[in-house]
Amino acid sequence: MTEARIRIESLAFGGAGFGRLEGKACFVPFTAPGDLVRIRVAVDKPSYLEGETLEILEPSPDRIAPPCPVFGICGGCSWQHLRYDAQAEAKERIFVDTLWRFGRVERDAVAPFAVADNPFGYRCRAQFKIRWSGGRLHMGFYRRGSHYVIDAPAECVICDPAINLTLRDLRLVLPDFSEPDKIPQIDAATGEDGHVLLVVHYIGDNPGRAADFFRSIQPHLASVTGIHLQCGRKDSIMHVWGVDSLSYTVPGLGDQGRPLSLSFRRGGFSQVNYRQNRVLVSKALHLAGVGPGRRVLDLFCGNGNFSLPLASGGAQLVGVEDYGPSIDDARKNADFNGIGDVEFIAIDAADGTRRLRAAGEHFDTVILDPPRTGARDAVGEVAILAPERIVYVSCDPPTLGRDLGVLRKAGYRVVGSHGVDMFPQTYHIESVTLLIRS
């Protein structure tokens, strides 16, 4: 079988459309529920097929014209061809199905999906990949399914306007650098304070010369307020000029809900969507159910994104994070916002939990905000610690479901899970889930 017709029934985690062909599941990227498409079967496995669209015979009513000229080629977005309400509906269904499949979480425990009010122009961070071909600069993102760099359009539709201005300026000045092939990537980030910070990845043998070049072009980078050079791992980052950190706001619990201002330095983590981060923090605060005197442990705490809003309401908080500079940021953020009764420790989440338990510490609530790989090592330690509540923030439903399964076996039950659309135009799903000890 090389060509076939297939009706797309739904969307799957990973972004592809799902249908059935001769009894087999078939996944076809860039299709929409209701599409009738002619496909070429590209992958034929014993249990599933993967197809490539040759022709759309009957378009879905959910289908729209994607606004980006490189959509479908660029690996950044998967759903620009869908109306936003259809994207949100698909994400809610995928989230519900995934939690049931991996964690046996009932549908009634999943709250309505929190849609974004800014489905475009929301990304405050971007990693621009760079290659040179025939003396011409190509700067953008990886082609879907490869490490081949394609040019981003003049305006990436999901990036903050400040990021797009920076891309424009960099394209004008980078051709003057004497070692163009020694810069494979430039990270750009913007804060709600209006600053734009760059981290230039340099793989040459003369970082001093590279730093001198980026100092010399400062007048030509009107959109940029700080540059750093990274010559290896994150601990190699060196300051070149300008600002060292960016800031954004989150809701607080003290002083009638006064917002908190949090900063993070180059190399530190922040959510890519500041508006939806505030939605996420608000939901976490509600689910945590903490107040004055309650003991809270925040694992993977970063710069205090959840820790400090919780502590602003009087909770006694310990934050754990293995990236030392983020711990420094969290301490500075606590001081800046006048928040006491907090302790931040630079240590791995699982090791930190073990040490705190061995020291006789106990906690009413534990917050987890792990990376995409989940918290496999930490959740077992948290279960032994036996807090009354666990609030689990996740950016990957399958690893969330896996870890919820571990906690269920340890005597916890899921009482509420909230999906949040942090990443419109993609299949990625952020969420926050509350578990209570039975």
Swiss-Prot record:
CDD domains listed in its UniProt record = AdoMet_MTases
* Top-level taxonomic group: Bacteria
> What Pfam families does the entry give?
TRAM, tRNA_U5-meth_tr
Active site at which residues? 395 (nucleophile)
Residues holding S-adenosyl-L-methionine: 271, 300, 321, 369
One GO term under biological process is:
rRNA base methylation
Q: What is its EC number?
A: 2.1.1.-
InterPro entries found in the cross-reference section: MeTrfase_TrmA_AS, MeTrfase_TrmA_CS, NA-bd_OB-fold, SAM-dependent_MTases_sf, TRAM_dom, U5_MeTrfase_fam
What keywords appear on the UniProt entry?
Answer: 4Fe-4S, Iron, Iron-sulfur, Metal-binding, Methyltransferase, S-adenosyl-L-methionine, Transferase
- Gene Ontology MF annotations: 4 iron, 4 sulfur cluster binding; metal ion binding; rRNA (uridine-C5-)-methyltransferase activity
Positions binding [4Fe-4S] cluster in this chain are 68, 74, 77, 156
Q: Which family does it belong to?
A: Belongs to the class I-like SAM-binding methyltransferase superfamily. RNA M5U methyltransferase family.
Query: How is this protein named in the record?
Result: Uncharacterized RNA methyltransferase GSU1748
Give the species: Geobacter sulfurreducens (strain ATCC 51573 / DSM 12127 / PCA)
